[in-house]
Amino acid sequence: MKFSKVSLLAASASVALSAPVAVTVTQHVHQAATVVVQGIVRVENGQTLTTFITKGTQTASASPVATTSAPIVVANAQVDSIATSVIQESAVVAESATFEESSTETSEAFSTATATIQAVQTSASATQDDVTTTLTSSTQPTSTTTPTTTTTSPTTTTSPTTTASPTTTASPTTATTTQSTASSTQSSSSDFSTSMVNEHNTKRALHKDTGSLTWSDTLATYAQNYADSYDCSGNLVHSGGPYGENLALGYGTTGSVDAWYNEITSYDYSNPGFSESAGHFTQVVWKGTSEVGCGLKSCGGEWGDYIICSYKAAGNVIGEFADNVMPLA
């Protein structure tokens, strides 16, 4: 084993007065056996003595070392560097002048340790390769394709959802169509109710002390049910219900209100009372009426739209015309 004389002399000088001996055991793990090299550095009679003792059975074939050797550590830092160089360098012990002066025990220990250290150093390069290979091999599970396969599985699993989509899509489509139709119907109904109540209030506003009407869904439902039952024959027959009522055919929506109101020309304010020729007009402007609701049926062709409006409270009450049919403002 080759040592630097300068290093050895420096170590010898520095540890001459060193405190108690520090012992480090370096263990080399092989596949078939374990060899333990024990290095002891001590100061005796002013001389620095180093003893190496091999424990365990030495294996002839150099097997890959699983772990790297730890350096021999002693109390003095300079001796530590010497011990490290002993592990790292391989040569004949006799070449070291310093160790020639050591005791026979030391020389024998070096001779015994040399073969062991050479075997360890011979396998050092293989150890590094094996360690690298082992690390690479142990790292492989991290990059294994199993997670990728697992990740792909959910994608495949979602396929039934995609397959089910047409059914789900068809349902919203139907729902959307239904909603659109309902929305359109509601919008049309809203437009109809707004236009009808506004047209009534426009006419009522022309008369003194005559308030506006409000739309009643209850009256509108009653009127619409009766309109739906109309046979579009051209004959107009009153429903006979509890509300005041005006009917029209072929005038359109607001056109019906206009036609009813135009009967004002037949009303005699000087002789207030009911008249067949002015009955629709008096119901439209009846002061005591506060609610209105109308129904519509399209007969098409010759007759056009059938309109029915129901009123609450009912107008045309005998004996109350003077108080409820107010003159123009």
UniProtKB/Swiss-Prot annotation:
Keywords: Glycoprotein, Lipid transport, Lipid-binding, Secreted, Signal, Transport. SUPFAM superfamilies: PR-1-like. This is Protein PRY2. Residues 122-197 are annotated as: Disordered. Belongs to the CRISP family. Residues 197-311 form the SCP domain. Secreted protein required for efficient export of lipids such as acetylated sterols. Acts in detoxification of hydrophobic compounds. It comes from the Eukaryota. PANTHER family: CYSTEINE-RICH SECRETORY PROTEIN-RELATED. Residues 122-131 have a biased composition (Polar residues). The lineage of its organism: Eukaryota, Fungi, Dikarya, Ascomycota, Saccharomycotina. It is found in: Secreted. It holds the Pfam family CAP. One of its GO terms (cellular component) is endoplasmic reticulum. GO terms for molecular function: sterol binding. The keyword Cytoplasm does not apply. The SCP domain is necessary and sufficient for lipid export and sterol-binding. Residues 132-190 have a biased composition (Low complexity). GO terms for biological process: fatty acid transport; sexual reproduction; sterol transport.
